[in-house]
Amino acid sequence: MKKLKLLFLFISLAALGQDNDSNVWSGFDTNGFSGVFYNRVTPVEGTTYLFDNWEQNAIVHKILKDKFLVRRVNLNLNKMTFDAKITESEDVLSFSFKGVDKVEINNRTFKNILYNKSNRLFEVFYTDDNIKFMKGFEVKLIKASKDPMVNRPFDQYVKTESYYLMNKKVLSKIKLKKKEIYKTLGLSNEDISKLNTFIKSTSISLKKEKDIIKLLTYLNSI
């Protein structure tokens, strides 16, 4: 396995080009890996980031099979980027997913996938040659309201998540219900019978991520 390369070796060099008169710093492209410096501000309540803190590290897998280690990282659901804190200040370095296959954080795998003509961040739970089971993340900006009954004096970022199945490259949003899962998978009557027997014998619940992974693993084996 190739050694992990520390991105911060060239992050430090790129930081030398900081423009103190602007909130956005100059972009760069290093070995096909692009990013931009910017000064993060929070003009609204809530956050566009997936994680509550910046304590996690990430292993970035490029399409060309190179790997990079990024420290103090978070995932920006609004910009569809992964961002790294350079110091304890609010300054961050923002990376696009261009040329990136996946990002691993705390043994979780994230991919940027096109859905409904826009890029969206997905956590991949299961994958084989035909099927992927994932959770998709999205953030929406809810405008402030002057109505005192609404109790929303400021704009607010609200994060949502949904489950998805990809079957033969067709990505579908689903609810964790057996009928909907079976329909999305396009199962034959024979496969449905086998899966029903498997569910009954193992007492798994299709409302749990880990049990759906077990079901799909079994389906791939028959």
Residue ranges of model-derived segments:
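Bacterial Sec-dependent N-terminal signal peptides
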Residues: M1-D21, L215
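Sec-dependent signal peptide cleavage junction
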Residues: G17-T47
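Short hydrophobic/aromatic-rich motifs at helix boundaries and adjacent loops
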Residues: F28-N31, M166-K169, T184
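Aromatic-patch recognition
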Residues: Y49-D52, Q56-K178
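Compositionally biased P/S/T/G-rich terminal and signal peptide-adjacent segments
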Residues: K173, K177-D191
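Long, compositionally biased interface segments
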Residues: L185-I222
